């Protein structure tokens, strides 16, 4: 019996072929795999907006200035939101990584409870490893053919290892005067240029010059490595004399370089990895004495 009521006819519309097809597919899938949940269709609520060349240039400039501070990048670009900027940045970083281009990619920001906060600082263990005990030279004294350092050289090595700067008068004695006092109570200071070649002279007032004379020598330019390594070689030469006099006559930068290398040498020689080399030296010395006899 067909209803003649027009309202009822509008409420029950005729089923289209598309709806019938979707219903059939859903019923078939449900019958084959009833335990599988049907995923909800993904709908794009907002269309993606393309980036203009000017906006992309602003984005690249903001990356150089603010790294991954998206809020500041948003304010700098002006026409994009943080969500759009982060999405654009993700695609840009993947493109750079894929193409291997030399572009600025800021490092990822640290997590709140990161084990190594960004930027990473030098660990305390690495700094503590430099402060080694002065008992190591006594172990080195047992090496064949080794001449013990005198008291002055041992004191300098103690300065290098401990990192403790001696009083001003002792430092002046070791490094020499850095400034010269003229006859008119004017002090002339000579310092190397930034490139390490040549020097520049200027005259200072009495009060300012005296303050500079009491300060520790500044490190400028490059050390004379020939002089530095010649001195370190003389430390192991039993016939070498006047080592302290050579140290006093050195430039401050050469003096500091000698202390640094002697400290590193002390640490390396005291390393357990050096023991096989020490045993080899002992065996070679015994073999040499046997052949000589």
UniProtKB/Swiss-Prot annotation:
CDD domains: SANT. Residues 70-93 bind DNA. GO terms for cellular component: cytoplasm; nucleus. Keywords: Cytoplasm, DNA-binding, Nucleus, Transcription, Transcription regulation. Induction: Circadian-regulation. Peak of expression in the afternoon, and lower levels in darkness. Residues 188-207 are annotated as: Disordered. InterPro entries: Homeodomain-like_sf, Myb_dom, Myb_dom_plants, SANT/Myb, SANT_dom. One of its GO terms (biological process) is circadian regulation of gene expression. Disruption phenotype: Monochromatic blue and red lights have opposite effects on the period of triple mutants rve468 lacking RVE4, RVE6 and RVE8; lack of blue light-specific increase in expression of some circadian clock genes. In long day conditions, rve468 plants have a larger size and a delayed flowering. In short days, rve468 plants exhibit long petioles. It is found in: Nucleus; Cytoplasm. Gene3D superfamilies: Homeodomain-like (1.10.10.60). Residues 43-97 form the HTH myb-type domain. Pfam families: Myb_DNA-binding (PF00249), RVE6 (PF24904). One of its GO terms (molecular function) is DNA-binding transcription factor activity. Probable transcription factor. RVE4, RVE6 and RVE8 are components of the circadian system acting synergistically to regulate flowering time, redundantly to regulate leaf growth, and antagonistically to regulate hypocotyl elongation; their action seems independent of ZTL and HY5. Interacts with LNK1 and LNK2. NCBIfam families: myb_SHAQKYF. This is Protein REVEILLE 4.
């Amino acid at each position: 019996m067909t209803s003649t009521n027009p309202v009822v006819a509008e409420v029950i519309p005729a089923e289209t072929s598309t709806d019938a097809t979707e219903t059939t597919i859903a019923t078939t899938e449900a019958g084959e795999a009833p335990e599988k949940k049907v995923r909800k269709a993904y709908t794009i609520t907002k269309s993606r907006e393309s980036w203009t060349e000017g906006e992309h240039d602003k984005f690249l400039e903001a990356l150089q200035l603010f790294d991954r501070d998206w809020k500041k990048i948003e304010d700098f670009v002006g026409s994009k939101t943080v969500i759009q900027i982060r999405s654009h940045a993700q695609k840009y970083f993947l493109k750079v990584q894929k193409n291997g281009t030399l572009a600025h990619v800021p490092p990822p920001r640290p997590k709140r409870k990161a084990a190594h906060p960004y930027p990473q600082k030098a660990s305390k263990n690495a700094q503590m490893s430099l402060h080694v005990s002065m008992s190591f030279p006594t172990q080195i004294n047992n090496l064949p053919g080794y001449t013990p350092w005198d008291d002055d050289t041992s004191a300098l090595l103690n300065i290098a290892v401990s990192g403790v700067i001696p009083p001003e008068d002792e430092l002046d004695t070791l490094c020499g005067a850095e400034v010269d006092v003229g006859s008119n109570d004017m002090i002339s200071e000579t310092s190397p240029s930034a490139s390490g070649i040549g020097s520049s002279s200027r005259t200072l007032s009495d009060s300012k010059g005296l303050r500079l004379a009491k300060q520790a020598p500044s490190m400028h330019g490059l050390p004379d490595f020939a002089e530095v390594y010649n001195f370190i070689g003389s430390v192991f030469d039993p016939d070498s004399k006047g080592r302290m006099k050579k140290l006093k006559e050195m430039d401050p930068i050469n003096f500091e370089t000698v202390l640094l290398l002697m400290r590193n040498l002390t640490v390396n020689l005291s390393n357990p990895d050096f023991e096989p080399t020490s045993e080899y030296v002992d065996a070679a010395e015994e073999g040499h004495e046997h052949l000589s006899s």
